[in-house]
């Protein structure tokens, strides 16, 4: 979601003043009305990686979405799309919500359904589209033994579960304290309410619901905290599959040195 211009507080986007002179790439490249798609992100991110390598520097890919990170790091291939099929599935999503489509995906591809979750309508639609186009489970598109696209070292930050939950909940409260509602109010004239991807982002969807009176402040924050914890669990499950990942203690006083020692 850091691809989107104006979505800063809810995505914890690092402000330019904290870049320490190091170039950061693929921030603020989409309007909130644009649809984010991993199949488009992959070639753009790989182009940036190649350019950095050609300059003799080491690119650092930070994530985030497990699928987006993996699409760059590993040899992922993405099936095409079918406009009519996509339109039919999206019409079902709009009319019935994600629940019915999720049950269909659960019956067809339990692994993908578990990974995507029952509330991510857009990804459920894409998974069903791939399944109908290819006749194969979308989880089959995820390599069981990933082969790196380029030589790569993968580092992960590990934290005790109880402490992680506390920090995630506190972060959601900070989002509101730092002005998430005002940020979302500013995005409404830019079209976030009619967007396909941006309006469904965790935190932004709940802030919109609070602004329209669908949720109270406490309900919006509680829902955001619950979805954030669920997303974090999926992230951990995803990255645990990475071969050779090096887990580092997030609160190690020598964290930077420990990370550099692994490179």
Curated annotation (Swiss-Prot):
It is an enzyme of class 2 (transferase). It comes from the Bacteria. The record marks 65, 86 as: Interaction with substrate tRNA. GO terms for biological process: tRNA modification. One of its GO terms (molecular function) is tRNA dimethylallyltransferase activity. The keyword Isomerase does not apply. Its cofactor is Mg(2+). It catalyses: adenosine(37) in tRNA + dimethylallyl diphosphate = N(6)-dimethylallyladenosine(37) in tRNA + diphosphate. Keywords: ATP-binding, Magnesium, Nucleotide-binding, Transferase, tRNA processing. InterPro entries: Dimethylallyltransferase, IPT, P-loop_NTPase. Its EC number is 2.5.1.75. Catalyzes the transfer of a dimethylallyl group onto the adenine at position 37 in tRNAs that read codons beginning with uridine, leading to the formation of N6-(dimethylallyl)adenosine (i(6)A). Belongs to the IPP transferase family. Monomer. This is tRNA dimethylallyltransferase. The gene is miaA.
